[in-house]
Amino acid sequence: MSFFSFLLGEKKKTASVAKERLQIILAHERSSLSGKKRPDYLPDLQRELMAVISKYVKINADDIKVHLEKQDDLEVLDIKIELPDPAPSPAR
């Protein structure tokens, strides 16, 4: 962040802020994740994703699926979001 950005109050992009938050959550939870127990943060993550996406697109809660699985030494966070078909543009 540059000096002028600091003075002028330029904000970070929403996507980069969300990415940083997700990385922090994953790093924190990674150390405490044991076995196949579902982490406590997944329902909150799903609700927050729903809130953010609903600002731009009309979707249902069932359209977002969040799943965490462990593969060998890796943990994979799988997020599937089903977006509606775009509305046809009006003919001129």
Swiss-Prot record:
It comes from the Bacteria. Pfam families: MinE. SUPFAM superfamilies: Cell division protein MinE topological specificity domain. The keyword Cell division applies. GO terms for biological process: cell division; regulation of division septum assembly. Keywords: Cell cycle, Cell division. Belongs to the MinE family. HAMAP family: MinE (MF_00262). Prevents the cell division inhibition by proteins MinC and MinD at internal division sites while permitting inhibition at polar sites. This ensures cell division at the proper site by restricting the formation of a division septum at the midpoint of the long axis of the cell. This is Cell division topological specificity factor. It comes from Variovorax paradoxus (strain S110).
